[in-house]
Amino acid sequence: MKWLKQLQSLHTKLVIVYVLLIIIGMQIIGLYFTNSLEKELLDNFKKNITQYAKQLDVNIEKVYKDKDKGSVNAQKDIQDLLNEYANRQEIGEIRFIDKDQIIMATTKQSNRGLINQKVNDGSVQKALSLGQTNDHMVLKDYGSGKERVWVYNIPVKVDKQTIGDIYIESKINDVYNQLNNINQIFIVGTAISLFITVILGFFIARTITKPITDMRNQTVEMSKGNYTQRVKIYGNDEIGELALAFNNLSKRVQEAQANTESEKRRLDSVITHMSDGILATDRRGRVRIANDMALKMLGLAKEDVIGYYMLGVLNLENEFSLEEIQENSDSFLLDINEEEGIIARVNFSTIVQETGFVTGYIAVLHDVTEQQQVERERREFVANVSHELRTPLTSMNSYIEALEEGAWQDKELAPSFLSVTREETERMIRLVNDLLQLSKMDNESDQITKEIIDFNMFINKIINRHEMAAKDTTFVREIPQQTIFAEIDPDKMTQVFDNVITNAMKYSRGEKRVEFHVKQNALYNRMTIRIKDNGIGIPINKVDKIFDRFYRVDKARTRKMGGTGLGLAISKEIVEAHNGRIWANSVEGQGTSIFITLPCEIIEDGDWDE
């Protein structure tokens, strides 16, 4: 009867009641946990797959915007993007299908033969036609028997137009396997817990302290920077709510940390890829941040800048102090790289806390080298125009004054003076006409009217005209027999060749000889015209300048021969407007060669027979 008494004891009843409560509670918790875990795992799984799809969507959209649609390069880039996800365990296969339902790329090696073939899939058609995502479950065999697969389709859009579909097969069966394993573990754990509870009832309090222990462990992990772990929730009591709140706190801290890191990376990316140079210092003026553009403009390595005094890096330590920079926010021009000739506009700003404490300085270097060059060229251009107009005007004024003073009555001097005045007037007219033409080209108002012509006939016609006019010059031609067609403005290109040929004849000496060589490159559909003279040549340090406006190698001789200094500059503008190039090679004392490259089409015999 002792055992019956023991059975009826409060201790036993408490143990029995506790065991019954444990059994009921574990069943409820188990069901809730299993359902919640299943939903969480499935949601997380689908969220991950959806995230992969969105990442691919953004990257594929970028590929289509950067490259010609349907090009080989675009297809290869898309394949490379898909390959980045090929080895992910949860991915069965990813395909990219264009708007015509043609498979452009796939991660599955065994299905590479399906590339460029049309696929008939209802979910793909739905995604392409409606422009909306869709998903469904299917059974599929990946070599280890049939398993559940979650298929997800997301349309890819460029400028609101659907250009394709990302088709993803994901191994969701692994999630169910994981749930089964967890259920088995849970069942085993329940049995062990019941066994231990019956024998060691006095350890019941441990069920209360366990969540607290978990939270303590999670706190330790958070202090180490690990925010991914979560406290297991055993119930809905105050401790469970505390665990849930703790998990939410951990999640928010993780999100805040991720946002901070994201903003830091974004800021680093912006600073790195800025077109302006950035130097950021601490409160003592030591450089702590220098982007690539700043290093490039300064012509210095990173180790020669970071940690050094900013004003010393900018060679301003003898001109300014940090206090002066703080008081004066005006920008100024600075020659920061004499070797490269880089001129920058430097703006300084001070980083100040709300309390007024200075924490650092920022220098923004804006490259104005090109602007300064343009301004310098503008001033030179105005000076050259003024000089070119002043010279003939001064000459004309002198002759007119002489005529007013009575020279008009001299039958020998008067005609000579009038002739010089007329020549100077004509030179000014030519100069003004050339300036007007250059102005039209600069403003793109000088229209280029292209037409397809027989270039062989075109160049021979120009040479024949000059050959008939210049009896004292020998013209040598080396022009291919094949017909070369070029799409050019005949009037404009005639002006170019007339200018080059006139210069060649003008500066040739002795037995004047002008050679013409035309070579074609069928591979690139380009031709090169070379016009060579046996003239006085050009010094090697001046060859590249002859296409500059108003540049003359010998100013006195050029004016004497009636040149304005704008002919080759106009020729360069015309050639470049034809997608061509013009340059010169010269040996002083031996002659000069002018090279002109232009697009062309070479017609072989029989090409017109088709």
Swiss-Prot record:
Membrane topology (UniProt): Multi-pass membrane protein
Limits of the PAS domain: 263-334
Keywords, in A-Z order: ATP-binding, Cell membrane, Kinase, Membrane, Nucleotide-binding, Phosphoprotein, Transferase, Transmembrane, Transmembrane helix, Two-component regulatory system
Domain PAC: 327-380
Limits of the HAMP domain: 206-258
This protein's name: Sensor protein kinase WalK
Organism domain of life: Bacteria
Gene3D superfamilies noted in UniProt: 1.10.287.130, HAMP domain in histidine kinase, Histidine kinase-like ATPase, C-terminal domain, PAS domain
Annotated PROSITE patterns: HAMP, HIS_KIN, PAC, PAS
Modified residues (Phosphohistidine): H387
EC number from the UniProt entry: 2.7.13.3
Database matches in PANTHER family: SENSOR HISTIDINE KINASE GLRK, TWO-COMPONENT HISTIDINE KINASE
Gene Ontology terms, MF aspect: ATP binding; phosphorelay response regulator activity; phosphorelay sensor kinase activity; protein kinase activator activity
Entry annotated with the keyword Transmembrane helix: yes
Known function: Member of the two-component regulatory system WalK/WalR that regulates genes involved in autolysis and cell wall metabolism. WalK functions as a sensor protein kinase which is autophosphorylated at a histidine residue and transfers its phosphate group to WalR.
Catalytic reaction(s) noted: ATP + protein L-histidine = ADP + protein N-phospho-L-histidine
CDD domains assigned to the protein according to its UniProt record, in alphabetical order: HAMP (cd06225), HATPase (cd00075), HisKA (cd00082), PAS (cd00130)
Source species of the chain: Staphylococcus epidermidis (strain ATCC 12228 / FDA PCI 1200)
NCBIfam families hit by this protein: HK_WalK, sensory_box
Gene (name only): walK
Activity regulation summary: ATPase activity is inhibited by derivatives of thiazolidinone, benzamide and furan in vitro.
GO CC annotation: plasma membrane
